[in-house]
Regions:
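Buried hydrophobic packing segments
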Residues: 64-72
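PLP-dependent aminotransferase-like
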Residues: 73-105
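Conserved beta-strand scaffold positions in the cores of enzyme catalytic domains, especially
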Residues: 3, 55, 102-104
Length: 105
């Protein structure tokens, strides 16, 4: 059974590792200007039915949660989380840095 306690405690799927080895020596521009990033963005646009959507990829779960929460909540709102919830135990500092309180139940 997989247990995703965070972004980095499980190994990668074998197919992903194979593909990384296959493409390892390719010379590509960084910062999201490569063909793989563009392909991923197109797949996301298609899946969402939004061909004109701006897609921004982030490198980790904490960063992603902080950006999404900060952009969705009003300044006076907070996040309600279980006491044992990942956002409370592992990400609260990142969330509260944006000015939002994590309210543990």
């Amino acid at each position: 059974m997989l247990f995703f306690v965070n972004d980095y405690c499980e190994g990668a799927h074998e197919a992903i590792l194979r593909r990384l080895v296959e493409t390892n020596m390719e010379k590509l521009p960084g910062y999201g200007f490569d063909k793989y990033t563009e392909s991923a963005k197109e797949k996301i646009r298609k899946a969402c039915g939004c061909p004109e959507a701006e897609i921004y990829l982030l490198g980790g779960g904490t960063q992603t949660n902080a950006v999404v929460i900060a952009s969705m909540l009003n300044r006076y709102e907070g996040v309600i989380a279980a006491e044992t919830g990942h956002v409370n135990g592992h990400e609260a500092g990142a969330i509260e840095y944006t000015g939002h309180k994590v309210l543990a139940l």
